[in-house]
Amino acid sequence: KADYYVDLHCGDGFEGLVSYVYCTGAAAPEVAAKSREMAEIAHVDYLVTSMYGTGGAYNYAGSMGIPSILLERGHSSRWCEDLVAEDVHDVKNILRHLGVLRGKSHMHGKPPVEVSPVIYEDAPVSGCWYPAKQPGETFKEGEVLGRICDYFGRELFVYRAKMGGIILYQTISLCIMKD
């Protein structure tokens, strides 16, 4: 039995990302509220409330009544001492906030900015991915976010922003497969 769940991620090998946190939203109101509290203690700039009850251990935990978050920090399945130290600091701070560890928790300036709605795009074709934006960069509705080309440079598909927002994570490998 778990009272709380904190999942630590660093992006898959093909993903670039800016540090952010997911909290579970598809849960009982008190579980979702405690998950959000945990997320707001994290020292990241952005927060996403996931409205899925499945698709990840933290979502499943939330659906089972366990307040949970997923911290994304790092990229490309890489790590460094500074990022590990930030995760350790966040986990200890969250545990202090929850009363699991002694001591006083603290906020890091302002709470993370809620990113909502979130659009997850899949590749409609396989090819070579040429992003126009990097994780952490903002964009306006209609802006080109990236292109998929064939091996000879012929454009197969152009991604345009459906609304203004920020790139939290994206594929950073040249090869992209149709989803």
Predicted regions and their residues:
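Structured catalytic-domain cores with a bias toward divalent-metal coordination
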Residues: K1-D179
